[in-house]
């Protein structure tokens, strides 16, 4: 390559980089501001629910109206995260801008009346809808739209959790299992950092988690404990199986609601009756809402699972039940924060069984169950480092990667595609959506059941 050609090539790279910075930073500022508004509203809604316990009885009405409004005015927005992933894989009509206000209001309403849901799905949809609007105004081509949508995902994720590096990697990793979308690396990183900074500039503070195990020991002098590593490996397998069960049961519950209740607005009414019944059956409301904090110190919360003095064996299971019923019926929000709760609770229980540090295992479960349910082990490992520190990197990596392998070809995102199979023995064509893999698996299972009945 001649000198002139070399400098011309570098100039084109710099020009492309400058263009993307100019495009994604304003978009990320908008997304970060919306995420700040969302987190502030969510905090107020959660506080209001604790202050006014009777709000739970409005759950059936809220759910009915929410789905009814989506049916009449939110057409094209109902696909949620799966719609955004589909648009990145195969750009079509784009992500409607109305998705942003619809998902923000409906998620806050879900939490106000006690639905067990999260916030990641809302943040990603805020990012995707704003990014799509910027793409339409900028008249971008299909390839550029894909990159901007990925940057929108990174912005939403990075801002809502305060983990910009994990947000950038999540946007590259979540689309296709086993394959990273490196063409969007710089735009996604810039968007995640800008959105996170904007969210902080609005005064939003994120929860800080503390792991007492090995506190004060620099990461550079850390040496592995072989027995503890073996326990972490076993826990990683269990986290992956838990993630697989959560994903499969979520999709099965959603299909069951659609099969047995054709009128969509009635589904959340039925779910509300189930949830309120469970509250009175169990005698507690601790599995409602986000589950990050509670004014009642005896309630199970994500923060509480990091306390070595607390042992809770079944909170992870009940939180999974409450979340699956809530989201599969049509209430809005994300699955990720409930997955954090489920993982931290399961980690706390496994620590008691294995004789391991409770705070460390709560942290491992926090990220590993998420890794298994979304097939994003690298992003989750990085998130663990951003939230809990680099001292525990090896344990975080082992837990996340084993959970990813053991969760199989399942995902909470049915639009996610298979790039590289997790096992060489899996004869699944590349770029097959998880939705098709699951449908094939269900048909095969039904066929085997019919054959067994005939015999």
Curated annotation (Swiss-Prot):
Knockout mutant characteristics: Deletion of the gene causes serious deficiencies in nodule development, nodulation competitiveness and nitrogen fixation on Phaseolus vulgaris plants. Deletion mutant is unable to form stable symbiosomes.
Keyword Cell membrane assigned: yes
A GO term from the CC aspect: plasma membrane
Residue intervals passing through the bilayer: 20-40, 54-74, 147-167, 184-204, 222-242, 262-282, 322-342, 350-370, 382-402
InterPro entries: Cl-channel_core, ClC, ClC-type_chloride_channel
UniProt keywords, alphabetically: Cell inner membrane, Cell membrane, Membrane, Transmembrane, Transmembrane helix
Coiled-coil ranges (or none): none
Disulphide-bonded residues: none
Location of this chain's protein in the cell: Cell inner membrane
Domain of life of the source: Bacteria
GO MF, one example: chloride transmembrane transporter activity
Major localization class: membrane
Short name of one Pfam family: Voltage_CLC
Membrane-protein topology: Multi-pass membrane protein
Function: Essential for the establishment of a fully developed nitrogen-fixing root nodule symbiosis.
Family, per entry: Belongs to the chloride channel (TC 2.A.49) family.
Name the record gives this protein: Symbiosis-assisting ClC homolog
């Amino acid at each position: 390559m001649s000198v002139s050609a070399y400098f011309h090539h570098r100039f084109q790279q710099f020009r492309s980089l400058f263009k993307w910075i100019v495009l994604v930073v304003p978009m990320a500022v908008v997304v970060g501001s919306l995420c700040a508004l969302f987190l502030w509203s969510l905090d107020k809604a959660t506080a209001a629910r604790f202050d006014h316990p009777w709000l739970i009885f409005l759950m059936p009405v809220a759910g009915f109206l929410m789905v009814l409004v989506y049916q009449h005015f939110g057409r094209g927005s109902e696909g949620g995260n799966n719609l955004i992933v589909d648009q990145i894989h195969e750009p079509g009509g784009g992500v409607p801008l109305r998705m942003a206000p619809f998902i923000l209001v409906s998620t806050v309403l879900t939490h106000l009346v006690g639905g067990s849901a999260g916030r990641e799905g809302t943040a990603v949809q805020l990012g995707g809808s704003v990014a799509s609007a910027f793409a339409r105004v900028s008249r971008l081509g299909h390839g550029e739209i894909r990159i901007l949508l990925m940057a929108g995902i990174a912005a939403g994720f990075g801002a809502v959790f305060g983990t910009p590096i994990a947000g950038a990697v999540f946007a590259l990793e979540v689309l296709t299992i086993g394959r990273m979308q490196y063409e969007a690396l710089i735009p996604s990183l810039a968007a995640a950092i800008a959105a996170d900074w904007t969210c902080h500039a609005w005064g939003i503070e994120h929860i800080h988690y503390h792991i007492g195990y090995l506190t004060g020991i620099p990461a550079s002098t850390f040496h592995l404990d072989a027995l503890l590593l073996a326990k972490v490996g076993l826990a990683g397998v269990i986290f992956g199986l838990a993630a697989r069960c959560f994903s499969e049961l979520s999709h099965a519950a959603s299909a069951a609601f659609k099969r047995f209740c054709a009128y969509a607005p009635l589904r959340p009414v039925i779910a509300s009756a189930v949830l309120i019944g469970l509250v009175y059956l169990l005698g507690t409301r601790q599995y409602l809402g986000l589950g990050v904090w509670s004014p009642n110190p005896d309630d199970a919360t994500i923060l509480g699972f990091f306390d070595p003095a607390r042992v809770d064996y079944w909170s992870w299971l009940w939180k999974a039940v409450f979340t699956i019923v809530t989201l599969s019926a049509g209430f809005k929000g994300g699955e990720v924060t409930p997955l954090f709760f489920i993982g931290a609770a399961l980690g706390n229980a496994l620590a008691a069984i294995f004789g391991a540090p409770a705070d460390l295992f709560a942290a491992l479960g926090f990220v590993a169950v998420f890794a298994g349910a979304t097939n994003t082990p690298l992003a989750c490992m990085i998130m663990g480092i951003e939230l809990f520190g680099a001292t525990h990197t090896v344990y975080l990596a082992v837990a996340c990667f084993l959970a990813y392998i053991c969760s199989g070809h399942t995902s909470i995102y049915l639009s996610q595609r298979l790039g590289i199979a997790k096992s060489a023995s899996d004869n699944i064509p590349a770029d097959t959506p998880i939705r098709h893999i699951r449908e094939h698996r269900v048909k095969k299972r039904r066929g085997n059941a019919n054959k067994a009945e005939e015999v």
